Amino acid sequence: MRKINLIVVHCSATRSDRRFSVEDLIACHNARFGFTGYHYYITRDGQMYQTRHENLPGAHARHYNQHSIGVCYEGGLTPDGDYADTRTREQKAALHALLKSLKVDYPDALILGHRDLPGVHKDCPCFDAKTEYSQL
């Protein structure tokens, strides 16, 4: 079993007025990596999908994949393409429940956003995940 010390939250960087289904995510990642890079994906309606087994490294945070779990929510861009926290109430609830469950399995893992990793110059996940989930 892999030693997990990070749970990294991402957004799909897709516009909030356009659907990006789990099938779209899988097709996009398969074309790029040959597999899905995130371990979990949460769509706007709050549905959570496991898209990669936890004991396999992902492809979501360069230099950190070996010891992390990647969780992505659908969205992160306004209809105009600006970065924003576009999580729905359902996504927030599903994300909180998933992260709480992952902390049971990986109690020493730090939850943070992709943007919080050293050397990452992105807005992803477009909110302060480190602060929001610091009490889990």
What is each stretch, according to the model?
Residues 1-56:
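Short, conserved "active-site rim" segments that organize catalytic pockets and cofactor/ligand binding
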Residues 1-8, 12, 16, 44-47, ...:
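Basic/polar, cationic surfaces and motifs that engage anionic cell-wall
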Residues 20, 59-66:
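A short, polar/proline- and glycine-enriched secondary-structure boundary/capping micro-motif
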Residues 55-62, 100:
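Short amphipathic alpha-helices and their capping/turn segments at secondary-structure boundaries
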